[in-house]
A protein has these predicted regions:
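ATP-dependent NMP and nucleoside kinases share a basic, alpha-helical "lid"
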Residues: 95-140
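Hydrophobic positions on the alpha1 helix immediately C-terminal to the Walker A/P-loop
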Residues: 25
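Conserved lysine of the Walker
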Residues: 22
């Protein structure tokens, strides 16, 4: 437990493939932490990149991953600089560990981004592949590519390898948190414990 005199300043990268329930979980985490008087901000990396990309004529967020990698790098760098200047007690950086591009899997957090943001923690939200599959199939609000249990397992493996690399490069801890069906409260408490709040 932190003493009130201590100044908290954490930058927590939180990732999860579609269907792990990341958005709902982040909402629950923020509510719990905010109730303690700690000032929390959630920054959606993709949304911030999209806002800047509009200046280049990008009209849809899904177009971001279709941009040339060099343009994505530029947008990532600018977004990282904006996030690094934030002074909230805790900043959650909601992002993807990887982006599936026409050139292959591109890291959501390349080294230059890590060096700019200097995250204090990396959290990977996960769930059983079958649960992820079922959640994706029920989600009619998204236009997702065809999926299988095997492709979900591959995505989870890529996410873990990308995020563990980020942990090595930054020297900050990484924790995988399971967000199993009906256990969001438990998952939220596990994230809060992992970041030392």
């Amino acid at each position: 437990m932190l003493l009130l005199e201590e100044k908290i300043h954490k930058k927590v990268v939180i990732v999860g493939i579609p269907g792990v329930g990341k958005t709902s979980l982040v909402t629950a985490i923020v509510e719990k932490i905010s109730d303690t008087g700690i000032v929390v901000s959630v920054q959606s990396y993709g949304t911030l990149m999209f806002e800047e990309a509009k200046n280049f004529g990008v009209k849809d967020r899904d177009e971001l991953r279709k941009l040339p990698v060099e343009k994505q790098k530029e947008l990532q760098k600018n977004t990282a600089e904006n996030i690094s200047s934030l002074t909230y007690d805790i900043v959650f950086i909601d992002t993807n560990a990887f982006i599936s591009t026409t050139e292959g899997f591109y890291p959501g957090l390349p080294n230059q981004v890590i060096q700019i943001i200097q995250p204090t923690h990396f959290i990977a939200i996960s769930a059983r592949p079958e649960e992820i599959y079922n959640r994706r199939m029920k989600d009619e609000t998204r236009n997702r590519d065809k999926i299988s249990i095997e492709s979900i397992k591959k995505e989870l493996a890529i996410q873990d390898s990308m995020l563990s690399t980020c942990s090595v490069l930054s020297g900050s801890p990484m924790k995988v948190i399971l967000n199993n069906e009906g256990k969001i409260e438990e998952a939220a408490n596990n994230v809060i414990k992992a970041i030392g709040v």
